[in-house]
Amino acid sequence: MAFSPLRRFLLAALLWLPFAFFVWFFFAGPLVWPVIALVRFVLLTAWPQLFTAVSQGADLLDVQGRVLEHLPYLMQLSTTVMVDVAEPGAAPRFGMIEPTVNPMVYGYALPLFAGLVLATPVSGRWRLAQLAVGIPLIWIAQAFGVIGESLKIVLIDAGPVGAEAAARAGLSLNLIALCYQFGYLILPSLVPAVLWIVCNRTFIELLIRRDNVEPVAARRVEAPPDGDG
């Protein structure tokens, strides 16, 4: 039984997408390295009065504070924002905010785009070209989301202390919240879809033309033979 191009694409996507997500998670550490490097450059260059260090890898702790495992895809921040970490009613005990951010939350666009590209019936050279252009753009969008969350944790979640630090740095809390929502809710799904559509317009136009032609062909009927009168 012959499949239409759309069905062949959907079947290929059904096979390639799980594989792409598996590879993405298996190589999570190396794949987030460019993102963390970009985030480090932006945070330490733009707001050195807030951030002192950005490092890759963090320990996963249990409720008792014991190390369960070291996760190489996490990102650790060191800041200059000081908060009171003492229990309510206890003597003040101050410490710097050192949050951990998970860049993978913003990175599922990469396997989604890769799976769609691999499922599209184009030449191998064009597939490689799409990945070579698309992956760096996805890393930039991913870094935008990570930066938004980093600022949100340090300046919004920290309460009044964070608000004061934001005012000193000339940052708007509303703008930070907007950037965080945009980077978390919109970019991870929008970027791979737009990239795939832009890079594969010929294939999409083929699908549209075929869908427009097939219903017309299905309505054709043969003219009845001439009667004998």
List PLM regions with ranges.
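Juxtamembrane non-transmembrane "cap" segments at the membrane-aqueous interface
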Residues: A143-A166
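Primarily interfacial, aromatic-capped hydrophobic alpha-helices that serve as membrane anchors
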Residues: A165-R220, G229
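N-terminal signal-anchor transmembrane alpha helix
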Residues: L6-V63
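Mid-length scaffold segments of soluble, non-membrane domains
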Residues: Y108-L112, L118-A141
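Hydrophobic alpha-helical membrane-insertion segments
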Residues: W16-A28, A132-L151
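Individual transmembrane alpha-helix segments
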Residues: Q64-L116
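Alpha-helical transmembrane segments and their helix-start/interface "positive-inside/aromatic belt" motifs
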Residues: A2-P18, R125-L137
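Structural signal for the C-terminal ends of transmembrane alpha-helices
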Residues: F26-F27, V117-G124, I197-I204
